[in-house]
């Protein structure tokens, strides 16, 4: 690693730490020539994925679009930004592990739904309503029942009081 101060090519690693759950590594280095210290970061270079949309179009995988969809589903829910980062990392890791250059958008949606189902039922329903294109309240009711939701008995009001 080239020293940013003197340009020498020899530096020794003083300290290494994993960041983001092992997604990257921070290294403190010391230049052998000038003795100054500097920090470097290492991460695996992401593979370029193309997403195959339902209509057959192809577009590059956009982590920002994924993050925005999660943010909308989790809006005003008691979920930390770290959880959103965890889901994004899970999706990226699973897609990269496929070893293919193209993935169907439906696979991305199913991974997100699986993660949201474990995290927050309301966010799951919000995301599912868009992803699964609910046409009416009956679609919503079926999805909620699949989560274990049961409608409460109707409350009647005595109008004679």
Swiss-Prot record:
Query: GO:BP terms for this protein?
Result: negative regulation of DNA-templated transcription
What does this chain do?
Negatively regulates transcription of bacterial ribonucleotide reductase nrd genes and operons by binding to NrdR-boxes.
Keyword entries, A-Z: ATP-binding, DNA-binding, Metal-binding, Nucleotide-binding, Repressor, Transcription, Transcription regulation, Zinc, Zinc-finger
Q: Required co-factor?
A: Zn(2+)
Mind listing the GO molecular function terms for this protein?
ATP binding; DNA binding; zinc ion binding
Family (UniProt): Belongs to the NrdR family.
The entry's free-text remark on the cofactor is: Binds 1 zinc ion.
**Zn finger intervals (unnamed):** 3-34
Species whose genome carries this gene: Thermomicrobium roseum (strain ATCC 27502 / DSM 5159 / P-2)
Checking InterPro entries in the record gives:
ATP-cone_dom, NrdR-like_N, RNR_NrdR-like
Is ATP-binding one of the keywords? yes
Name listed for the protein in its UniProt record: Transcriptional repressor NrdR
- Fetch the PROSITE patterns from UniProt: ATP_CONE
The yes or no answer to whether the keyword Transmembrane is present is no
Which residue ranges does UniProt annotate as crossing the membrane? none
Please report the stretch or stretches of sequence annotated as the ATP-cone domain: 49-139
One Pfam family, please name it.
Zn_ribbon_NrdR
């Amino acid at each position: 690693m080239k020293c940013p101060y003197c340009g020498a090519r020899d530096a020794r690693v003083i300290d290494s730490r994993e960041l983001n759950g092992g997604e990257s590594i921070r290294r403190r280095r010391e230049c052998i020539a000038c003795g100054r210290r500097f920090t470097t970061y290492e991460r695996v270079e992401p593979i370029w994925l193309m997403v195959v949309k339902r209509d057959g179009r192809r577009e590059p995988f956009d982590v920002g679009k994924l993050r925005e969809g999660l943010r909308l589903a989790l809006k005003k829910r008691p979920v930390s930004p770290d959880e959103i980062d965890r889901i994004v990392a899970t999706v990226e890791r699973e897609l990269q592990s496929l070893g293919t250059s193209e993935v169907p958008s439906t696979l991305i949606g199913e991974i997100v739904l699986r993660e949201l189902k474990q995290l927050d039922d309301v966010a799951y329903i919000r995301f599912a309503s868009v992803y699964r294109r609910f046409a009416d309240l009956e679609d919503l009711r079926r999805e909620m029942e699949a989560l274990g939701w049961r409608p409460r008995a109707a409350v009647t009001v005595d109008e004679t009081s």
